[in-house]
Amino acid sequence: MKKPLFFIASACVTIYILFALSPSVYAMHIMEGFLPWQWALVWWLLFLPFFLVGMRNVARLMRQRPEVKLLLALATAFTFVLSALKIPSVTGSSSHPTGTGLGALLFGPFVMTVIGTAVLLFQALLLAHGGVTTLGANAFSMAVVGPLVAYVLFSLCKKFGVSTRVSVFLAAMMADLATYVMTSIQLALAFPDATSGVWGAFLKFASIFAVTQIPLAITEGLLTVVVWNFLHTYSKRELTILQQKGATIE
């Protein structure tokens, strides 16, 4: 059971390093110092409660179910890899998948908040993608809103009898799109359009992101289904443990 997980996690980290060390344009994360300090503070304050709950959940998970550590590492590596696959955008910045849907479905949205924040902090400090002052805003969109959307949508799909594969696809895809809708809102609030205000600015940012992000979201959804099927083939024991704890949904 553990060898396939170790292989995937190792492959994910290797691919991530290759992409991370390659030259690239600015990442989609809001860069350091870009937001006015007032808005940077607001997003930090909104993000922190989710992070603290997530830290508590991670500590409890590791204490009660240490067997799932490798699965947690896999979810982290999956997020690292997908968020490193940067594609140039029409704005001169870049778009990328988020990879938060899988972890949210396995461990719940709050544990995924911690994983996503770790990814963002690593990128900010070592790769100059995003920033420390804007970490609250970036984490709120990618590590809070995205996982919550994935978890809630997956729950609703299963409640209404949608197949697991379709549910996973929709959850991962919408987690990606929700992240960039939130980012568009953040930028629009900080930099409203001179004539059309916040709504006009939001439409501009969202339409620019949509050019690359919609295809990426669909691709991420399909890839998440592939990984989900792999886990259900080779890691049934770990998934059963999570299901018994109530962290994952069948």
Swiss-Prot record:
Keywords annotated in UniProt: Cell membrane, Cobalamin biosynthesis, Cobalt, Cobalt transport, Ion transport, Membrane, Signal, Transmembrane, Transmembrane helix, Transport
Question: Which terms does the record give in the GO molecular function aspect?
Answer: cobalt ion transmembrane transporter activity
* Swiss-Prot/TrEMBL GO biological process terms: cobalamin biosynthetic process
**Which pathway?**
Cofactor biosynthesis; adenosylcobalamin biosynthesis
Q: Which residues form the signal peptide?
A: 1-27
- List the GO cellular component terms: ATP-binding cassette (ABC) transporter complex
Q: Where is the major localization of this protein?
A: membrane
Q: Name one Pfam family in it.
A: CbiM
Assembly, per entry: Forms an energy-coupling factor (ECF) transporter complex composed of an ATP-binding protein (A component, CbiO), a transmembrane protein (T component, CbiQ) and 2 possible substrate-capture proteins (S components, CbiM and CbiN) of unknown stoichimetry.
Similarity comment: family membership: Belongs to the CbiM family.
From the Swiss-Prot or TrEMBL record, give the protein name. Cobalt transport protein CbiM
From which lineage does this chain's organism come?
A: Bacteria, Bacillati, Bacillota, Bacilli, Bacillales
Which gene carries the instructions for this protein? cbiM
